[in-house]
Amino acid sequence: IGGSFAGLSAALQLARARRTVCVIDAGAPRNRFADASHGFFGQDGKNPQTMIAEARAQLLRYPTVRMLEGAATSAAAVAGGFEVGLSNGLTLDAARLVLAFGISDVLPEIPGLAGRWGKSVLHCPYCHGFEFSGRRLGVLQTMPMSAHQALLIADWGSTTLFLDGSDVPDS
């Protein structure tokens, strides 16, 4: 379950091991708002959607692979493996199940933030920090670890932690 980088990587290794593979993809990868992906040799700076399309094309050359568009809405252990329910009402049976659906970002309700997400409002300095090096950076406190994030991104530029009124951990 998951048709972005992690799910496609798992599917490739399974296909090369001659396993039957069905990749279920809801079509909403975490990096869908970013224009470029970084940190992959041979792919650095490439559009994530282009990378996914190329990976899918490579995978579909293996005769044991199929891609299924849709969202998995349930998964349950059954005799002999798993039963996966899909949003279109179909049910699939599988001997093994790889959960590679990643993370969903929950954005604070701040006017204008969603439109900048993945472009100038970012979640990961390792993914996007280099392109913003030397600029003034900010971290919006949304959880206790936000102070740690502000200390972390200070390596990329002058950083301000914007507090939301909740406590900042001493450590």
Question: What are these model-predicted stretches?
Answer:
Residues 25-28, 63:
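Structural signal for hydrophobic packing residues in well-ordered secondary-structure cores
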Residues 14-15, 36-39, 111-115, 152-155:
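Short, glycine/charged-enriched secondary-structure capping and boundary segments
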Residues 21, 33, 108-110:
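Short, function-defining helix-loop hinge/capping sites that tune catalysis or transport
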Residues 32-91, 167-171:
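N-terminal Rossmann-like dinucleotide/flavin-binding domain of flavoprotein oxidoreductases
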Residues 5-22, 48-55, 61-62, 100-101, ...:
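N-terminal FAD cofactor-binding segment of flavoenzymes
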Residues 2-7, 39-42, 48, 102, ...:
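Glycine-centered flexibility sites
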Residues 1-23, 30, 123-169:
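Rossmann-like dinucleotide/flavin-binding elements
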